[in-house]
Amino acid sequence: MIQQESRLRVADNTGAKEILTIRVLGGSGRRYAGIGDVIVATVKDAIPGGNVKKGDVVKAVVVRTKKQRRRPDGSYIRFDENAAVILKNDGDPRGTRIFGPVGRELRDKKFMKIVSLAPEVL
């Protein structure tokens, strides 16, 4: 469950290391984001020479959450960290590599490019 002011690790090679959530997209009163939901965030920590700089406002999709999520078959999935992938305006990932596993929910929400770049889909 990601909400305003939540900090997430960035799971791609855009140069950002950590982002802070500004807003959860998808409705005026929406409070929480889970795997596959899009957020607006600001870059809090970045490496020099990367595509994004500290202070940039970006859109990102959540790919891992610590809070468990119940799947339709009754199983639960949870990860060791909260992580996101930075997006371009057309919804494609800005980076060219994805680090770590991603949730299968991304396939249902039509983030096929992220699913194909990810080393593992759980």
UniProtKB/Swiss-Prot annotation:
Keywords: Ribonucleoprotein, Ribosomal protein, RNA-binding, rRNA-binding
Entry's Gene Ontology cellular component terms: cytosolic large ribosomal subunit
Biological processes per GO annotation: translation
A Pfam family that the UniProt record links to this protein: Ribosomal_L14
Matches recorded under CDD domains: Ribosomal_uL14
Protein origin, superkingdom: Bacteria
SMART domains (UniProt xref): Ribosomal_L14
GO terms of molecular function: large ribosomal subunit rRNA binding; structural constituent of ribosome
Function comment: Binds to 23S rRNA. Forms part of two intersubunit bridges in the 70S ribosome.
Family designation: Belongs to the universal ribosomal protein uL14 family.
NCBIfam families per UniProt: rplN_bact
HAMAP family: Ribosomal_uL14
Subunit-structure text: Part of the 50S ribosomal subunit. Forms a cluster with proteins L3 and L19. In the 70S ribosome, L14 and L19 interact and together make contacts with the 16S rRNA in bridges B5 and B8.
Record protein name field: Large ribosomal subunit protein uL14
Name of the gene this protein is made from: rplN
